[in-house]
């Protein structure tokens, strides 16, 4: 049985894993696993977070990028998907409530529910 080796993403051990990456996570600016790893660490921990200080030093970010690139640590799919994208919905659980038992509040709850669901979030209603 031949061993799979990709020229573009040598980290992947099977064509199936590379196909999943290409179908679900690859996009402009993150065409390879290595690019996605670097952008993800910058987005979440680095200086790409507008108006906020980096959560990690450059050395720590470099080490984390290396771990992700080598598949020693793989972040959740939601983080992989949103890396480098304009809109990011890392947290996707919402708890909603109707404040008063009125038509208006129930209509507002419906609107909030639809808005949450359109971002791919899950909802709970208290």
Name these PLM-found stretches.
Residues 1-126:
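Extended catalytic cores of very large enzyme megasubunits
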């Amino acid at each position: 049985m031949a061993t799979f080796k990709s020229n573009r993403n040598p980290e992947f051990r099977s064509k199936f894993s590379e196909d999943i990456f290409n179908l679900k996570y690859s996009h402009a600016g993150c065409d390879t696993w290595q690019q996605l790893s670097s952008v993800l660490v910058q987005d979440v921990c680095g200086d790409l977070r507008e108006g906020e200080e980096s959560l990690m030093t450059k050395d720590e970010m470099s080490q984390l990028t290396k771990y992700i690139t080598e598949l020693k640590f793989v972040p959740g799919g939601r983080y992989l998907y949103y890396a480098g994208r304009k809109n990011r919905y890392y947290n996707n659980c919402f708890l909603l409530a109707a404040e008063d038992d009125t038509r208006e509040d129930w209509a507002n709850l419906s609107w909030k529910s639809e808005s949450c669901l359109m971002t791919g979030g899950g909802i709970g209603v208290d």
